[in-house]
């Protein structure tokens, strides 16, 4: 499956709370360029470190998707719900796709809207 299809399917599955995890490589490299920067290796570690975020997603919009070979950049807007209320987060997500799986993911976003 080409890079575009893999990344689009990831977002489609994530939106409908489907089987998006199946698109992740077991040796996924994840970096969150927030303060402090967080880096984890492995699908299980990624899922554990992002569980709170994924539990808050009400909806998401892929505002732009740029593909070049095995690389993809998605500009996304998440509508999120926490016990403290609703908020949105704009995120830049950089993917590397290998063998139809997401091998690396780096994200950039402002942490200010997130509840402490």
Give the role of each language-model region.
Residues 1-16:
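Short, aromatic-enriched amphipathic alpha-helices that serve as compact interaction elements
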Residues 58-61, 86-93:
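Short, surface-exposed coil-to-beta transition loops
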Residues 93-116:
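Short beta-strand edge/turn micro-motifs at domain boundaries
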Residues 69-78:
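A short hydrophobic beta-strand element
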Residues 78-80, 97:
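Hydrophobic beta-strand positions in extracellular immunoglobulin-like domains
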Residues 4-5, 18, 25-69:
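A solvent-exposed, acidic/Ser-Thr-rich amphipathic alpha-helical stretch
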């Amino acid at each position: 499956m080409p890079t575009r299809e893999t990344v689009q399917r990831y977002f489609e599955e994530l939106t409908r709370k489907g089987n998006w995890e199946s698109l992740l490589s077991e040796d996924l490299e994840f970096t969150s360029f927030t303060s402090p920067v967080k880096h984890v290796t492995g699908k299980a570690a990624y899922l554990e470190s992002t569980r709170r975020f994924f539990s808050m997603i009400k909806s998401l919009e892929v505002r732009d998707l740029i593909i070049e070979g095995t690389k993809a950049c998605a500009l996304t807007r998440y509508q999120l719900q926490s016990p403290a209320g609703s908020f949105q987060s704009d995120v830049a997500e950089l993917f590397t796709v290998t063998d139809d799986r997401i091998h690396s993911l780096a994200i950039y976003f402002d942490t200010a809207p997130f509840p402490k």
